[in-house]
Amino acid sequence: MKLKKEWIKQGFINEPAPEGTDLKAEIRRMCKEKNAIILAHYYTVGDIQDCADFVGDSLALARKAAETDAQVMVMCGVHFMAETCKLLSPGKTVLCPDLNAGCSLADSCKAEDLKKFKEEHPGYQVISYVNTTAAVKALTDVVVTSGNAKKVVDQLPLDAKLIFGPDYNLGNYINSVTGRKMLLWNGGCHVHERFSVSRIAELKKQYPHAVVMAHLECKGPVLALADVKGSTANMLQYAKEHDAKQFIVATEAGILHELQRTCPDKEFIPVPPEISESGMECSCNECQYMKMNTLLKIYNTLKYGWPAVEIDEAIAKDAVKPIERMLELS
């Protein structure tokens, strides 16, 4: 198949489906025909989560990518997640519906900058959050997710000199609960950085009995207000297992779909966008990159087999090692 120049320029296929096409049904048909599975992160829109074979957080998606028998994986999330799938299953085709689906955290740590930082700190091990490019992972000793970071760090020698990046907030939290003094990269998620103490405090006045759940990518003062601190999977588990009927949720709004699906008798209140200096609200509780995934793009990527993720062999050889070490330790 010859790729159109406009597809390559755009980074995705924008061909319209034939009139009357049931996108979900056609996606499921093509998955069966091509031995493909749809993997979706909790932050994608509800229609995609409902159409997916597997929905999870970064850790669960990595595990699924490593164990699946499918020959084709469509990773509905962001680009580093598709790279992780390819690293763990190099012989399989990994499709990414939109190559523009990046990550502000991954963008905050370039491989050349990390390499220089390592050279300035000889003898240090590098712990990289999974929200990084394959090139950064290739410079890393072990990868972590928000769901297993503490568990992994706890297993490293107490006298180990550690660099943690790129999420400053997650690293700061891990330092606080482990007593470590890791050197922290100054990166952050554009969504979680914008949650504020004042907006959560306002919600607590409206819902005094609600449990506050906050993602570990949030700033320290926000985490200090939270009753539950953890990954998206941690939040889901807590909501399912506890009797509280109301939850204030400080993470990307896509998780509300799965929370409501699994706990239909409970109320989940998203922390609203903060008000800017201009008085305007921003949609900062949504990740613009996750929302680049659409049913039409999934339909097209399955139909045409593009965009497919490819990673330089030399980078892939080094990048897969810290991911495999993470899976062993967690």
Question: Each predicted region: which residue ranges?
Answer:
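Active-site loop-to-helix "anion-binding N-cap" substructures in soluble metabolic enzymes
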Residues: 1-230, 234-249, 256, 261-271, ...
